[in-house]
From Swiss-Prot:
Its EC number is 1.2.1.50. It comes from the Bacteria. This is Long-chain acyl-protein thioester reductase. InterPro entries: Ald_DH/histidinol_DH (IPR016161), Ald_DH_C (IPR016163), Ald_DH_N (IPR016162), CoA_reduct_LuxC (IPR008670). The lineage of its organism: Bacteria, Pseudomonadati, Pseudomonadota, Gammaproteobacteria, Enterobacterales. CDD domains: ALDH_Acyl-CoA-Red_LuxC. LuxC is the fatty acid reductase enzyme responsible for synthesis of the aldehyde substrate for the luminescent reaction catalyzed by luciferase. Keywords: Luminescence, NADP, Oxidoreductase.
Length: 480
């Protein structure tokens, strides 16, 4: 089966090239996706587009809500096509693909949540619409301008959030899709076009693709005209973005991270196992927030392990795994055999839907992902802290929730960036940080309009007449 995906340039769907020489392909097993090859015309149109977004925040939120209502409709053609593409090309199960579409609708339709994101990260939901008085100045946040989003394909929703952050801050949004997921950003942009092809938000979007191999001169030219770069992915992807960013541009880096779960002597083993299983199974551990290790403190270790197996089997039913290709199955089997050869105890599902490897803390072979978890029985938090690594550990999920208050300072000081209740790793709460930062702050420029000389300060209750102060040598008189 083949699928053609056209580029979207400044909100307009480009005509798909007729010549095979102008087309590139991405292979997904027996299926292929065809896309145009980036050309000079695409680049020029992206660079030349300079329409300022004069919408107010409520206009932006209302437009996103309207788009979200379409995604909420299970019969919406874009939604149905998107689910089908995730299943056919990316190997998602029906439940996984449907859940992804559901989350897109949830995020777009959460008007209160979108307002609160701006309020929490920028300090006021009005700061991009008007000048706000702050002490001795007025302040307003303006968009950086042209933002490019170099997306990874492991977590489609991360791309959605990246795009929405740029939209909420009124930036032009150029999206470079991943070879592993050329579908999500394209589907979102097409749904914007469905609602209003001439809307300023629609027109501010471009969705393109280029491979990292071969000639990337046109991609580098785009990069040189960007005001802010949002880079997702592994070390090579991040390094490429940094290398080709113009010197004045901010590079917002979302690199690969690891996460784990702490179970602290729970009374409710069923809830503990349910939360841990969720954190293992969501995205089949391809997300930075996915738990790859569990550190269990306390008694009832064996009982917890049995409960975890039960819940992993439950998730295999309610949220079935993505399809594994030959190499992934081989990697799974290899890790199992390596662990057994090393004398570790291994519990594995006969269909490779999950695997539990029991080992001492720090003893770990390769991680094949796909719901493989290393389970460590430890005595106390001090035996866990060495495995929290600065700039490498993202999310630590904890059960019971009350234990988070005991450990959060120690975990944060070691480098943990996010602490959540077990079972909540995929929900980034409003008001929280992402990889140790507030991303919206880096998508805007704060401009100050400062008060005149006759405006008195708290510590200087007279007009600021600097020439007179110099003439009369009275500066020190006003030092508090």
């Amino acid at each position: 089966m083949t699928k053609k995906i056209s580029f979207i340039i400044n909100g307009q769907v480009e005509i798909f090239p007729e010549s095979d020489d102008l087309v590139q392909s991405i292979n997904f097993g027996d299926n292929s996706v065809y896309l145009p090859i980036l050309n000079n015309s695409h680049v020029k149109n992206i660079i030349d587009y300079n329409e300022n977004n004069k919408l107010r925040l409520h206009n932006i939120v209302n437009f996103l809500y309207t788009v979200g209502q379409r995604w909420k409709n299970e019969e919406y053609s874009r939604r149905r096509t998107y689910i089908r593409d995730l299943k056919k090309y990316m190997g998602y199960s029906e439940a996984m693909a449907k859940l992804e579409a559901n989350w897109i609708s949830m995020i777009l339709c959460s008007k209160g949540g979108l307002y609160d994101v701006v309020e929490n990260e920028l300090g006021s939901r009005h700061i991009m619409d008007e000048w706000l008085p702050q002490d001795e100045s007025y302040i307003k946040a303006f968009p950086k301008g042209k933002s490019i989003h170099l997306l990874a394909g492991n977590v489609p929703l991360s791309g959605i959030m990246s795009i929405l952050r740029a939209i909420l801050t009124k930036n032009q949004c150029i999206i470079k899709t991943s070879s592993t997921d050329p579908f999500t950003a394209n589907a979102l942009a097409l749904s914007f076009i469905d609602v209003d092809p001439n809307h300023p938000i629609t027109r501010s979007l471009s969705v393109v693709y280029w491979p990292h191999q071969g000639d990337t001169s046109l991609a580098k030219e785009i990069m040189q005209h960007m005001d802010v770069i949002v880079a997702w992915g592994g070390e090579d992807a991040i390094n490429w973005a940094v290398e080709h960013a113009p010197p004045y541009a901010d590079v917002i880096k979302f690199g690969s991270k690891k996460s784990f779960c702490i179970i602290d002597n729970p009374v409710d083993l069923t809830s503990a196992a349910t939360g841990a299983a969720h954190d293992i199974c969501f995205y089949d551990q391809r997300a930075c927030f996915s738990a790859q290790n569990i550190y269990y403190m306390g008694n009832q270790y064996e009982e917890f392990k049995l409960a975890l197996i039960e819940k992993l089997n439950l998730y295999a039913h309610i949220l079935p795994n993505a399809k594994k290709d030959f190499d992934e199955k081989a990697a799974y089997s290899l890790v199992q055999k390596e662990s057994l050869f090393a004398g570790l105890k291994v519990e594995v599902d006969v269909h490779q839907r999950w695997m539990i490897i029991e080992s001492n803390a720090g003893v770990e072979f390769n991680q094949p992902l796909g719901r493989c978890v290393y389970l460590h029985h430890v005595d106390n938090i001090e035996q866990v802290l060495p495995y929290v690594q600065k700039n490498k550990t993202q999310t630590i999920s904890i059960f019971p929730w009350e234990s988070a208050f005991k450990y959060r300072d120690a975990l944060a000081l070691r480098g943990a960036e996010r602490i959540v209740e077990a079972g909540m790793n995929n929900i980034f709460r409003v008001g929280g940080s992402h990889d140790g930062m507030r991303p919206l702050q880096r998508l805007v420029t704060y401009i100050s309009h400062e008060r005149p000389s006759h405006y008195t300060a708290k510590d200087v209750a007279v007009e600021i007449e600097q020439t007179r102060f110099l003439e009369e040598d009275k500066f020190l008189v006003f030092v508090p």
